[in-house]
């Protein structure tokens, strides 16, 4: 047993976000950032994973290594992709168009609910700067354009952290009981 889950974490509950997606994106950000800082002396700004990559719920109760393999059965590794602020806007437009609760951390998208147009984007509570490079933690699958995330594939700035996303979940659950 790695940890205890006080409530079921499920990707099907939520329109723009899900509790399991938020958890996985936050874990990826939290555990990937020190590795990126040590290797490249840079900081992850945003983490974006994909809704379809979450393959099971984390049920209320004991969380085991098997749970981690059921939730994340793929051998996805953490890739950090450098995107301009303009490309971040494209990323936000993709999320809105998809209408799926893709796991996201470090970014807020404010939209007009009637038109679904973007009013404002914040990265770590700061307004988006279209000329800046932002470092986005994601999976190797998405970095290569999976799920039609072509904004990642087109980037020339990529860092392979050689760190399995599932292993991050296991490590985090070993450290924190709930």
Residue ranges and their predicted role:
Residues 22-178:
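Feature captures C-terminal
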Residues 13, 18-24:
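A conserved active-site cap/scaffold subdomain adjacent to cofactor or substrate pockets
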Residues 1-4, 175-177:
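Short intrinsically disordered, low-complexity coil segments enriched in acidic
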Residues 2-15, 70, 149-153:
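Acidic/histidine-rich, surface-exposed loop or edge segments in extracytoplasmic proteins
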């Amino acid at each position: 047993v790695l940890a205890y889950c006080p409530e079921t974490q499920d990707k099907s509950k939520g329109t723009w976000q899900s509790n399991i997606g938020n958890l996985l994106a936050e874990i990826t950000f939290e555990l990937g950032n020190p590795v990126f800082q040590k290797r490249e002396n840079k900081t992850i700004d945003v983490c974006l994973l994909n809704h379809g990559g979450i393959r099971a719920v984390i049920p209320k109760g004991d969380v085991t290594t098997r749970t981690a393999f059921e939730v994340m059965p793929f051998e996805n590794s953490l890739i950090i992709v450098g995107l301009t602020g303009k490309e971040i806007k494209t990323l936000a437009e993709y999320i809105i168009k998809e209408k799926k609760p893709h796991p996201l951390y470090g970014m807020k998208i404010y939209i007009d609910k009637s038109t679904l147009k973007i009013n404002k984007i914040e990265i770590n509570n700061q307004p988006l700067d279209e000329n800046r490079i932002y470092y986005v933690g994601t999976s190797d699958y998405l970095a290569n354009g999976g799920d039609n995330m072509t904004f990642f594939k087109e980037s020339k700035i990529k860092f392979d952290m050689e760190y399995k996303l599932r292993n991050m979940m296991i490590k985090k659950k070993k450290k924190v009981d709930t």
